Structure formats: C-alpha cells, structure tokens
C-alpha cells in the first residue's frame, strides 16, 4: 500500500487552543448503526465517482474506525476540486432517499452482471468469494458485490455529517507488483456535531504530530542516506530514551525480573527451528553469508530467550523465571506503511518472557498486569481497553492446556478488577493472549501491551524442567511486552503530551536566562549547582533580548525558565516561569534545587512550587 498523499479539503477548522468539546465520538466497532452509515456512505461515494468519472473502476470500499474509503482505478489523479464535486454529488444522492437492498445471486449471474459493466476488479473479487454471493443495490442505478450491512435508505445518512478527507495511493490487493489505485478517504457520523468534533480532533492531532515535534524539539530524525525506517536519536531524544529505559529497568528489577542481552543476528538454522522462516520470512531481512554460514537479523527476541533457558538443566524449584530485555529487532516494512516512529524497520522491543509452572499462570499474569499499570501510568496513560483472545479453530496444544491457560488469564484480569472483552477464537494458534490499548489525550486508542501464552516455542525447542517427581515436563512460556516498541511508544507519548513533557522526563528541565553580561558569572554558579544536583539545566548564550529568549524557550517547551537579573543575583535567587504553573515569582536557589530533586525522584509533572 502506498503512503498517504494528503489532498487538503476546505473546512472550518477549530483553533487548536480551544478545549476539546464534550462530544462523545462513537466508534465503528462499538456502534452497529455507525458501521452501517459508514459502509453505506462508501457506496454512495463510489456511485458519485462513477457518475462524474465514467471511466473510473471500483475495487473495494470498507468502513474504518473513523470513516470509510474506496479504491478506484481512474486514468487521472483526483484533485481537491474533484473531491468537492464528488461530495456535492453525494449530497444529491442522499437527498434522493434511495433504498439499499441486499440481493442474493448465483455466481453465473454475478459474473454476467460484472462483465456487462466491464469491471475486471470485481471479477477478481468474485473468484475469491464463497457462496452465497450477495450484492447491494443503491436505487436502481448502481450496485456492488458486498456482504453488508447497510442502512435501509439514504435518508438515514445525514447530508451534513460527512466529509471527504484525503486521497492516497494504494496497490491492488496491497501488492506493489499490481496496479496502483487511488484511495479516497472519508468520514461519516450520525450528527453534524460529531463531525465538527472529529474535525477539531484532527486539527489537534496535527498539532501533536510526533514527526513535526521530533524535528522542532530536536529529538530524533530519519535520514534518507541511512535508509527508510531507521531512527537517529539526537542528544535531547537520547536523554529522554535513557530516562525511560532506566525507569523500565528499575521497575523490572523491583518486579522480580533479571535482564538479558542477546545478539542482533543468528544462524539461519535458529529461524528454521523457531518457525520464523516458515511463517515470518516476508518480514525478515535477507540472509548474509559469513564464514560459509548464513545469518539473519533477528525480527524477534523470543528464540534467544528460549536458548538461554535451554542452556542448562532446569528444576521446578527455579520456576518462575522472569527475563526481560530491551532488544533491538529488525523487520522489513514496505515503503508505503512506514510512518515516523510508529512503523520503522529497526526498533527496540521491551520483551520479557516468563517460564513457569501451570499452576503459576494466574499469579504471573497478575504480576504482569500490575507492572504494566505501574509503567504506563507513570507516563500518564490511565485508561485502557482490554481484549482477551481465546483458542482459534486451528491451534496446537491440548484442550486441557488451553483451558488452563485461558482460565489463568481470565482469573488474573478479574483479580485485577479490570473490565475486558472476550474475542472468541481470536488467539494465536499457539496460545491465548491479552491485548491492551491505551487512550491518549484526544481520545485515540493505541495498541500497546501484549501478554501472550506460547505452547509452540517450548515444543519446538524441547524445553523442559525436572518436576518434583523426577519426570521432565514442558514449562509454560509467557511472552510479554509493555511498550511494545520503544520507538512507537515514544511517538505515542510525544503526541499524548503534545511535546510538553513532564518535568522529570524533559530533556532540558531548566534554562537560565541571564538578562545582562554582568550576571553571567552568577548564572554559571547557579548552573553548576543545578547540574551537581542532577538537574538537566543550560544557560541561554544567544545574547538576544529577554523577550526573544523567553519565546525561544517556550518554543522548545522547556518546563522551567529562570530569569536572572541584578536583583536576583543580589538576593541569591532566580525568577521562575513554569509552563504548567505560570509565573512562580522569585525563588531561592536552594528551594529550586529541593523542588527539582523531589520532582525527579518522584517522577512528577512539575516542580510543585506555588506562585
């Protein structure tokens, strides 16, 4: 699939400084009516496109979590003016109050209909469809192969509650060797008020875009000369990453984990044993020849932890074993899907694996849930959406083991007191899992943490332990990631904070602003005191006027700006301006040191000083 190529669409955008309106935006996955509205709106759009552009051929057009899209094969690129015309035509179609009717047809009848319209993409879709074959008509002039569901009549679609948002390139079937299509994205809601709120949030999302903030705040970059999807951490971003990693390590040591460091490459035979070459080869970088052996970059850390476990004979008395690693992995991502820090080719997973006894599952899962909550809440993620995925039709492992594992996950979630949904049959073939999504400041949900039981790798590698009766038994293996990808989590976190990082996490916590050269020696004295106390502080050396250096500090989102003039130097004090708390007035250096050290130790968002 090709990357997004936004085409701006005129709309009355709300200012980003205004607070988000208290309008609850439903999700497609939670509202059957909204799903029908969006699915039907995609058909209305396709009908409008084919009326205005008779040579355009339709392919697929599903609903999404926030709207809908349709892929078209059209000789000419769609422009902003085209989108306006399409939207206008859609309004006319809605106003005609056309019925949407489901019709069941034979394969031959469907093929006859498609050939009459000369729609080769539909013929290819038809080849893959299982009977019964259904199509939906829109009035008596337009139809498409579709399983539904849809609204009964276009009068259920509000003419002022939809928008066409952008055009992107997309390959047919997501295959770069096939035809390149044009994907028109739209959004549709039940009311105009919901649409207005959606637009407001989109503007806010642009303000928070981690790619822009990463550049403006000098945190990271992706350099074309090095290659796509490879992250360069700049000093300010690297400082933040170190703080995150140090906290992560501390939390894991306190949670009973030991740390591992494992290689970045392995002999290709390891990936054969693990099954990655059978099931994951397309996402792996190709092999490299070294000393007549083939090696490949690791796409996952799991097999390395398995080998570490297998390096010696284990006893049931050792279990549970908890190992964690911040391990860099490498995965091939197509050019069109890479996106800032969210989708990259080299990234760090906060992987952990727990090897335990069957009767330890519930307790170990609960420990993981507690640790997950501790870590995520430290970064102000406190609202979660949790799914428990159970055994699919095709799976490995006995019914008894699956039942025991699923029961352990369920019990742990219930003991934790968290609400969760059950995705029947949604687990991996090798074990049930818990997926946790986090909600950010503007209501978006992000897939983050995963807890996955694995019956596959222990079997493939022949893992065992000596049980109390002297027999050898296979341990239960739990995969677990809290951040998922450290890079991706950093991007989500940056957007959640809009670059206004809490004091403890900010790469530069305090910037000293000497008003004149005469107070420079005093400013340097204060700087030394701050640095000695472990505070990340700098002095503005630009020589610009006070107003400009304050604006520069605000643009860099420095949590605390400390103005130093002759009065402050005489009083052994400083004047503080906090991004969170405003003007804090004149404060002694000693009070600042104590407040800053306390904020760092307790990982607080601000200094805690009163104006």
UniProtKB/Swiss-Prot annotation:
Cofactor binding summary note: Binds 1 zinc ion per subunit.
Top EC class for this record: ligase
Family classification: Belongs to the class-II aminoacyl-tRNA synthetase family.
GO cellular component term of the entry, any: cytoplasm
Record-listed Zn(2+) binding positions: 302, 353, 479
InterPro entries the record matches: aa-tRNA-synt_IIb, aa-tRNA-synth_II, aa-tRNA-synth_II/BPL/LPL, Anticodon-bd, Anticodon-bd_dom_sf, Thr-tRNA-ligase_IIa, Thr/Ala-tRNA-synth_IIc_edit, ThrRS_anticodon
General function of this protein: Catalyzes the attachment of threonine to tRNA(Thr) in a two-step reaction: L-threonine is first activated by ATP to form Thr-AMP and then transferred to the acceptor end of tRNA(Thr). Also edits incorrectly charged L-seryl-tRNA(Thr).
Gene that this polypeptide is encoded by: thrS
Protein location: Cytoplasm
Keyword RNA-binding on entry: yes
Entry's Gene Ontology molecular function annotations: ATP binding; metal ion binding; threonine-tRNA ligase activity; tRNA binding
Chief place of localization: cytoplasm
Protein name per UniProt: Threonine--tRNA ligase
């Amino acid at each position: 699939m090709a990357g997004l190529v936004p085409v701006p669409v005129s709309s009355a955008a709300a200012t980003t400084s205004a607070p988000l309106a208290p309008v609850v935006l439903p999700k497609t996955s939670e509202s059957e009516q909204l799903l029908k509205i969006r699915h039907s709106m995609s058909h209305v759009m396709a009908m409008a496109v084919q009326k205005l552009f008779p040579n355009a051929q339709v392919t697929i057009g599903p609903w999404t979590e926030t709207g809908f899209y349709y892929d078209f094969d059209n000789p000419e690129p769609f422009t902003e003016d085209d989108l306006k015309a399409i939207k206008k035509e859609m309004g006319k179609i809605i106003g005609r109050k056309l019925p949407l009717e489901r019709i069941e047809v034979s394969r031959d009848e469907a093929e006859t209909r498609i050939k009459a319209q000369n729609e080769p993409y539909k013929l290819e879709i038809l080849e893959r469809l299982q009977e019964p074959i259904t199509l939906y008509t829109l009035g008596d002039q337009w139809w498409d192969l579709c399983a539904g569901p849809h609204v009964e009549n276009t009068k259920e679609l509000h003419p002022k509650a939809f928008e066409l948002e952008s055009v992107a390139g997309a390959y047919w079937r997501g295959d770069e060797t096939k035809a390149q299509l044009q994907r028109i994205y739209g959004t549709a809601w039940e009311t105009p008020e919901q649409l207005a709120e959606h637009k407001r949030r989109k503007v806010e999302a642009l303000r928070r875009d981690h790619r822009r903030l990463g550049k403006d705040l000098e945190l990271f970059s992706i350099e074309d000369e090095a290659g796509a999807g490879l992250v360069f951490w700049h000093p300010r971003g690297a400082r933040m990453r170190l703080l995150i990693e140090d906290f992560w390590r501390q939390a894991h040591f306190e949670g009973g984990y030991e740390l591992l460091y494992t290689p970045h490459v392995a002999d290709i035979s390891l990936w054969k044993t693990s099954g990655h070459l059978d099931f994951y080869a397309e996402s792996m970088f190709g092999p490299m020849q070294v000393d007549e052996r083939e090696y490949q970059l690791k796409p996952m850390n799991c097999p390395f932890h398995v080998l570490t476990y297998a390096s010696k004979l284990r006893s049931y008395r050792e279990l549970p074993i908890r190992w964690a690693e911040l391990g860099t992995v490498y995965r091939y991502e197509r050019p069109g899907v890479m996106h800032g820090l969210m989708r990259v080719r080299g990234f760090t997973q906060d992987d952990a694996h727990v090897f335990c006894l069957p009767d330890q599952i519930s307790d170990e899962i609960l420990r993981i849930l507690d640790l997950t909550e501790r870590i995520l809440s430290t970064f102000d993620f406190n609202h979660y959406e949790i799914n428990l995925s159970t055994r699919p039709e095709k799976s490995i492992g006995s019914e008894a083991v699956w039942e025991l594992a699923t029961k352990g996950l369920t019990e742990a979630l219930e003991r934790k007191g968290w609400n969760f949904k059950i995705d029947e049959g949604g687990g991996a073939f090798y074990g049930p899992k818990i997926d946790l999504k986090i909600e950010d400041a503007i209501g978006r949900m992000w897939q983050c943490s995963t807890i996955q039981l694995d019956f596959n790798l222990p079997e493939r590698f022949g893992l065992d332990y000596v049980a109390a009766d002297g027999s050898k038994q296979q341990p239960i293996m739990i995969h677990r990631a809290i951040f998922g990808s450290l890079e991706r989590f950093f991007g989500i976190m940056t957007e959640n904070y809009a670059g206004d990082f809490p004091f403890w996490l900010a790469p530069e916590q305090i910037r000293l602003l000497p008003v004149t050269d005469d107070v420079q020696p005093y400013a340097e004295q204060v700087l030394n005191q701050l640095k000695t106390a472990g505070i990340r502080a700098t002095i503005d050396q630009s020589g610009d006027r006070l107003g400009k250096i304050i604006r520069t500090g605000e643009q860099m989102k420095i949590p605390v700006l400390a103005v130093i003039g002759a009065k402050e130097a005489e009083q052994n004090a400083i004047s503080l301006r906090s991004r969170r708390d405003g003007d804090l007035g004149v404060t002694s250096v000693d009070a600042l040191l104590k407040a800053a050290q306390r904020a760092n130790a307790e990982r607080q968002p601000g200094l805690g000083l009163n104006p």
